[in-house]
Amino acid sequence: MTDLFSSPDHTLDALGLRCPEPVMMVRKTVRNMQPGETLLIIADDPATTRDIPGFCTFMEHELVAKETDGLPYRYLIRKGH
């Protein structure tokens, strides 16, 4: 099985940051990416389990994978159009 988290185009370390900082940093990072590129987000704020999927839905990006069973949380998103 391939580890989806192993080769992202970009990585964002949001460890230690609290809402709303992680999603604000994700938005800023994604804005500078090209459509189709991937971003690995590493976070430990429980609010990201709600905020990151919500951000992807609202902004029409794909949540490719998430790992939220333990800390740190990991999310892989693919930029939409």
From Swiss-Prot:
Pfam families in alphabetical order: TusA
Example GO BP: tRNA wobble position uridine thiolation
Active-site residues (renumbered): C19
Keywords from the UniProt entry: Cytoplasm, tRNA processing
Subcellular location: Cytoplasm
GO CC entries: cytoplasm
MF term (GO), any: sulfur carrier activity
InterPro entries: Sulphur_carrier_TusA (IPR022931), TusA-like (IPR001455), TusA-like_sf (IPR036868)
Pathway annotation: tRNA modification
Subunit structure, interactors included: Interacts with IscS.
Function: Sulfur carrier protein involved in sulfur trafficking in the cell. Part of a sulfur-relay system required for 2-thiolation during synthesis of 2-thiouridine of the modified wobble base 5-methylaminomethyl-2-thiouridine (mnm(5)s(2)U) in tRNA. Interacts with IscS and stimulates its cysteine desulfurase activity. Accepts an activated sulfur from IscS, which is then transferred to TusD, and thus determines the direction of sulfur flow from IscS to 2-thiouridine formation. Also appears to be involved in sulfur transfer for the biosynthesis of molybdopterin.
Family statement: Belongs to the sulfur carrier protein TusA family.
Name by which UniProt lists this protein: Sulfur carrier protein TusA
Species for this entry: Escherichia fergusonii (strain ATCC 35469 / DSM 13698 / CCUG 18766 / IAM 14443 / JCM 21226 / LMG 7866 / NBRC 102419 / NCTC 12128 / CDC 0568-73)
